[in-house]
């Protein structure tokens, strides 16, 4: 016998008939339907995840090249040579990734893209990764369509001024007009810094790099503010670089990070390729001795064997990612270890003449911030 809906009752019939376990029949039917729905949903989501796992990496393999975004004109970091081929510190991390995927560092298309368009290009799916001095922030990291992977350069924001202003520290910039790049973390850091000091200032937000530098070099701005690495690079573009000085004040921390489209396999390939470069430097493996070391791995340190031996962790990782088991050796042979990349593009013998011994971008054992995650 059931309870029938009355004038104020629920709009359904509630049966009191029960089954084993004490549940009314109608609740048992609902329970079974819910279980079926949950199982179907789980299977569907599992199939979706499987279908999309490694999708971007597979696309790269099928097209035969990696597409990588860099700054279009940043001496030391990314700049076309006389043949129009991009060279530089950031470019080498594009080449690192291509070497890992294909065993050939040249299977990469380098695209010079302005900052305001770089992340949009990735989100739109028009490139696979970016290596162009992009600061990792919370809001960027949680943006759909982007994966921030690993920091390649620890930087900070600073100021460049004409020497004729005779300014020696940032606290003397009261009332200054500052040229800065629109859409970057630079603007917020300026507001925070000058706000703390209660100093008046004006900002010229100029997205186009050429226009921004022209405004600064021609005296329309008193100050140029950006990451220290960018300021050092930009100063080389002045008619007379010696006319400008970079102040010592650091007003922010800027972890410059490799970014890709979301894809676990691609992210892992990029991340662990960088770890290979760091670990290789730590153990003295470089582009000049890699062949000798891999030919006599039994004499190498266990950590080195784990990277390069075909029956150890590095090779096991490669098989899971679907790349060659010689990926690590290809990276070092084609691009070099992290120290080689730094010195070649940014070090004392380069146009930027950075002293790595005074930089956070050295190994922890040398007093820096860099160390390799364990490959085991």
Annotate each language-model stretch with its function.
Residues 92-101, 163-167, 171, 176-177, ...:
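Extended ligand-binding regions for polar small-molecule ligands
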Residues 95, 99, 103, 107-172, ...:
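Acidic, polar ligand-binding/catalytic clefts
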Residues 31, 48-53:
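Sec/Tat signal peptide C-region and signal peptidase I cleavage site
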Residues 15-19, 26-38:
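Bacterial N-terminal signal peptides that target proteins for export
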Residues 38-47:
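Bacterial N-terminal signal peptides
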Residues 67-76, 86-101, 135-136, 155-207, ...:
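Bilobed "Venus flytrap"/periplasmic-binding protein-like clamshell domains
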Residues 108-120, 203-218:
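Short helix-initiation/N-cap motifs at beta->coil->alpha
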Residues 53-131, 323, 334, 338:
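Extracytoplasmic small-molecule ligand-binding "clamshell" domains
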């Amino acid at each position: 016998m059931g309870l029938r809906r009355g004038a104020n009752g629920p709009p359904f019939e509630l049966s009191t008939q029960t089954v084993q376990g004490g549940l009314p029949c109608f609740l048992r039917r609902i329970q079974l339907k819910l279980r079926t729905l949950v199982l179907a949903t789980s299977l569907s989501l599992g199939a979706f995840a499987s279908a999309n796992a490694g999708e971007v990496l597979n696309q790269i393999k099928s097209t035969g090249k990696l597409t990588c975004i860099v700054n279009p004109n940043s001496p030391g970091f990314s700049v076309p040579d006389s043949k129009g081929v991009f060279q530089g510190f950031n470019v080498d991390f594009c080449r690192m990734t291509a070497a890992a995927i294909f065993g050939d560092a040249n299977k990469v298309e380098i695209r010079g893209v302005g900052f305001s368009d770089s992340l949009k290009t990735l989100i739109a799916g028009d490139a696979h990764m970016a290596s162009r001095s992009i600061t990792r922030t919370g809001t960027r990291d949680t943006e759909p369509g982007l994966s921030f992977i690993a920091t390649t350069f620890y930087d900070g924001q600073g100021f460049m001024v004409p020497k004729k202003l005779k300014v020696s520290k940032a606290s003397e910039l009261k009332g200054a007009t500052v040229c800065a790049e629109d859409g970057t973390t630079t603007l917020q850091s300026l507001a925070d810094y000058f706000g703390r000091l209660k100093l008046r200032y004006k900002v010229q937000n100029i997205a186009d790099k050429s226009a921004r530098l022209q405004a600064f070099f021609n005296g329309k701005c008193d100050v140029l503010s950006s990451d220290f690495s960018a300021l050092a690079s930009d100063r080389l573009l002045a008619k007379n670089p010696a006319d400008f000085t970079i102040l010592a004040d650091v007003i922010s921390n800027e972890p410059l990070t490799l970014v890709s489209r979301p894809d676990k396999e691609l992210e892992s390939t990029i991340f662990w390729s960088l770890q290979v470069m760091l670990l290789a430097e730590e153990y003295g493996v470089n582009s000049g001795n890699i062949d000798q070391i891999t030919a006599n791995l039994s004499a190498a340190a266990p950590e080195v064997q784990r990277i390069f031996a075909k029956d150890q962790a590095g090779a096991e990782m490669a098989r899971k990612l679907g790349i060659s088991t010689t990926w690590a050796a290809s990276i070092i042979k084609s691009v070099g270890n992290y120290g080689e990349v730094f010195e070649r593009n940014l070090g004392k013998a380069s146009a930027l003449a950075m002293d790595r011994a005074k930089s956070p971008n050295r190994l922890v054992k040398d007093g820096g911030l860099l160390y390799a995650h364990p490959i085991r």
